């Protein structure tokens, strides 16, 4: 691990690290040989045919971009004296800005906001939560579900993308529900 934006140092005792921050933020990077807590897989389809990113570049047609997430962090918790194996509750938000070469943009498990020139797409997924709760989509009404993927479809001319971004929070409790109205969902709160 190395400090990338300062001279602050840390001391280490086993896996515990203590930084001498003097009240300042620390920016660091490092490498690990451990599996990431969540694996993200991005798949691209053109007119229903799966393609590699370099194959789809420059092509036109009905494009689908699917973000699948696999939660790799299981833990054991005890509730009322019984032990349960549950996934760490991660909430993942994936977003992108699509230019005007993308039309008829739709997203599963997300929202599309257009300013006339660009479409901002934000999707939310909570991989592993259904398994931890031992529920399936059929346990919910059609208006409620626990999303585990994000899928964007659009008609595209000369496909290219600048970037996508994903943010992962360890638990949905980091979101504030204070202003969530009865008719809204967590996605509405995130996309405000």
Describe the role of every protein-language-model region:
Residues 178-185:
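Conserved small/polar residues in nucleotide/adenosyl-binding loops
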Residues 190-191:
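Hydrophobic alpha-helical segments, chiefly the membrane-spanning helices
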């Amino acid at each position: 691990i190395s400090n990338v934006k300062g001279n602050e140092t840390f001391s280490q005792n086993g896996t515990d690290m203590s930084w001498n921050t003097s009240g300042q933020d620390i920016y660091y990077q490092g490498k690990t040989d451990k599996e990431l807590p969540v694996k993200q897989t991005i798949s691209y389809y053109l007119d229903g045919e799966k393609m590699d990113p370099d194959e789809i570049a420059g092509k036109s047609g009905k494009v689908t971009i699917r973000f699948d997430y696999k939660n790799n962090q299981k833990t054991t918790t005890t509730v009322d004296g019984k032990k349960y194996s549950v996934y760490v509750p991660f909430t993942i938000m994936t977003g992108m800005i699509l230019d005007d070469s993308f039309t008829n943009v739709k997203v599963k498990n997300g929202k599309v906001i257009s300013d006339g020139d660009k479409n901002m797409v934000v999707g939310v997924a909570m991989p592993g939560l259904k398994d931890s709760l031992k529920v399936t989509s059929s346990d919910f009404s059609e208006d409620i579900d626990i999303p585990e993927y994000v899928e964007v479809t659009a008609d595209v001319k000369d496909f290219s993308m600048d970037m996508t971004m994903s943010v992962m929070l360890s638990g949905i409790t980091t979101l504030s529900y204070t202003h969530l109205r009865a008719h809204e969902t967590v996605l509405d709160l995130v996309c405000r």
